[in-house]
Regions:
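Extended interaction regions within the primary functional domain
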Residues: 1, 17, 79, 134-136
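Juxtamembrane low-complexity tails/linkers enriched in Ser/Thr-Pro and polybasic
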Residues: 3-15
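Short, low-complexity N-terminal intrinsically disordered segments enriched in polar/charged residues
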Residues: 10, 17-66
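Short secondary-structure boundary micro-motifs
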Residues: 11, 20, 49-51, 68-70, ...
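Core segments of small alpha/beta cavity-forming domains
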Residues: 51-93
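Alpha-helix termination/capping residues and helix-transition junctions
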Residues: 70, 104-107, 148
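Short solvent-exposed beta->alpha transition segments
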Residues: 77-124
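Exposed beta-sheet edge and beta->alpha loop/turn motif
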Residues: 114-157
Length: 157
């Protein structure tokens, strides 16, 4: 005995419902794709930025590194976002420096600076990766500035 497959016939109402469900799923998928794209960070060269000046960002990075080297944390406070003000102090910097090396020696020079603009969720961030030479060690700084040119993120390696 062979079973014959019979094609189920849909009523016009069932066809409309099926088409409506397909359209709803398609709209949800498109919306999810757009939201995912919007949340992903978009990177581009800082020179192409419409928000930041590459020269201003590099000058601000040099200024901050200079203040850190001079241990002028009072002047540094006006250059960082409020959330960073508590942690940008001598005690925390000494802890961070000790993790890298006990004896950095004197600052010699900034060797390289690489920059980018990062756009995520509509916010623009200027990021700078700085290689600085000290007498006894090479240090890598990562600085990120918000649109007001305030230091929003900082790291040393």
């Amino acid at each position: 005995m062979s079973k014959k497959k019979t094609k189920k016939v849909l009523t016009p109402e069932q066809k409309k419902k099926r088409i409506r469900n397909i359209i709803i799923v398609a709209v949800i998928l498109v919306a999810a794709s757009v939201a995912t794209y919007w949340m992903q960070p978009q990177n581009k060269a800082l020179a192409e930025s419409e928000v930041f000046s590459e020269e201003e960002v590099k000058a601000q990075a040099e200024k901050i590194i200079g203040l850190l080297n001079a241990e002028d944390f009072d002047s540094l406070q006006s250059l960082v976002v409020p959330d960073m003000q508590e942690i940008m102090n001598k005690e925390r910097m000494d802890e961070g420096k000790a993790r890298i090396s006990e004896d950095w020696g004197d600052f010699v020079s900034i060797e390289t600076m690489q920059d980018a603009e990062i756009i995520q969720r509509g916010a623009h961030i200027a990021a700078v990766y700085v290689t600085a030479e000290y007498e006894n060690i090479e240090v890598h700084y990562t600085l990120a500035f918000n649109e007001d040119m305030k230091l929003a993120s900082f790291g040393i390696q």
